[in-house]
Amino acid sequence: MVDLVLLNSKMRDSGMTITAIAEKSGISRETLYNKMSGSADFKASEILNLSNTLRLSALERDEIFFAE
């Protein structure tokens, strides 16, 4: 389960718009919105790309995308 509160916080902290984050992560803005609304799951490649775009540490990535 994804910790959307923490993901949103990291996205805000990045100073980038959602559109910029999506583009730098190689996904469409619509796809990112859908995944953040819970209507679709993040693929491993999207998790990796978002982690790189947001400069998340491995611990932060795991806390966000692999929360229990």
Predicted regions and their residues:
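Short alpha-helical DNA-recognition segment
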Residues: 16-34
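A structural preference for long, well-packed, hydrophobic secondary-structure segments
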Residues: 13, 34-35, 56
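The alpha-helix within a helix-turn-helix
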Residues: 11, 22, 51
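Residues in the recognition helix of alpha-helical DNA-binding motifs
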Residues: 10, 24, 35, 64
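DNA major-groove recognition helix of helix-turn-helix/homeodomain DNA-binding modules
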Residues: 45-60
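Short amphipathic recognition helices of helix-turn-helix/homeodomain-type DNA-binding modules
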Residues: 61-68
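A short, Lys/Arg-rich alpha-helix, primarily the initiator
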Residues: 1-17
